[in-house]
Design a protein with these regions (language model features):
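Conserved P-loop NTPase motor core
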Residues: 1-266
């Protein structure tokens, strides 16, 4: 196996060298230009990207500039600049691949890159997490980045839903400033945001609840477009064995049973 690796090279290494590294260079070359943008010019980039999509350009066409924009927004909003390896991770996720990242490599920050890029379609982008805390902390921590680019961020948990708003201050407080800026909203509003954070269970149960509704106005979710799954091995393999089951009171079916039971003997 080692002989074959030496002869043909590692597939991942070839992918990084041929597909990702040139894109990283393109993004890095844009950094000086984006650093000079005012906040007003930076937020206008989102509208310009959407206009270019409407005229026929693809997300892949926009990727270098969109990643450069989110990198600059992150540097200004939370003081963190995406490293080259994080740019590569973002590209892999955008392409639908699994990106394994070690602890400390900043996967929360990596996700902002493909989430922003795919949110430009205005069809919604989801970040699926293992628990409610990670959903709230992720949306609250990354929310200022998206906000600087004019992108709304929603979060849905077991007992609440909200939209990130830096001007809103939760009266209860949560011991972490990243959790204090979610303005309460309906689940429909949270899903209507450009980017929505939530757990696999909440997304799944809301999908099931929507299938029990009779009126379109009662639906929570919109059509599904793009999602990134955190801890993908746990969620799609380990937890996949646990069924999501939702039920309703059976009084109506019991009444129907009695009615049909009376008809059958006739």
């Amino acid at each position: 196996m080692s002989f074959l690796s030496k002869l043909f090279g590692d597939a991942n290494a070839r992918y990084v060298k041929s597909a990702l590294a040139p894109m990283v260079q393109d993004i890095n070359s844009l950094e000086p230009e984006f650093e000079k943008f005012s906040e007003g010019e930076l937020i206008l980039m989102t509208a310009k990207f959407r206009e270019r999509l409407a005229k026929g350009e693809t997300l892949d066409d926009l990727l270098p500039e969109a990643f450069a924009a989110i990198r600059e927004a992150s540097r200004r909003a939370i003081g963190k600049r995406h490293f080259d390896v994080q740019l590569m991770g973002g590209m892999a996720l955008h392409q639908g691949k699994i990106a394994e990242m070690k602890t400390g490599e900043g996967k929360t920050l990596v996700a902002t890159l493909p989430l922003y890029l795919n949110a430009l379609t205005e069809k919604g982008a989801h970040l699926v997490t293992p628990n409610d805390y990670l959903s709230r902390i992720g949306a609250g921590w990354m929310g200022p980045i998206y906000y600087l680019l004019g992108i709304s961020t929603g979060v849905v948990t077991n007992d609440s839903s909200g939209l990130y708003d830096p001007n809103y201050e939760d009266a209860h407080g949560h011991g972490d400033s990243r959790l204090n800026h979610f303005r309460p909203c309906t689940r429909h509003e949270a899903y209507a945001a450009y980017i929505t954070y939530g757990t696999n269970n909440e997304f799944g149960f809301d999908y099931l609840r929507d299938n029990l509704e009779y009126q379109p106005s009662q639906l929570r979710q919109r059509e599904h477009h793009f999602a990134i799954v955190d801890e993908v091995d746990s969620i799609l393999i380990d937890e996949a064995r646990t069924h999501l089951i939702i039920s309703m009171p059976d009084t109506e079916s019991a009444d129907l049973y009695k009615m049909f039971a009376g008809i059958v003997p006739q």
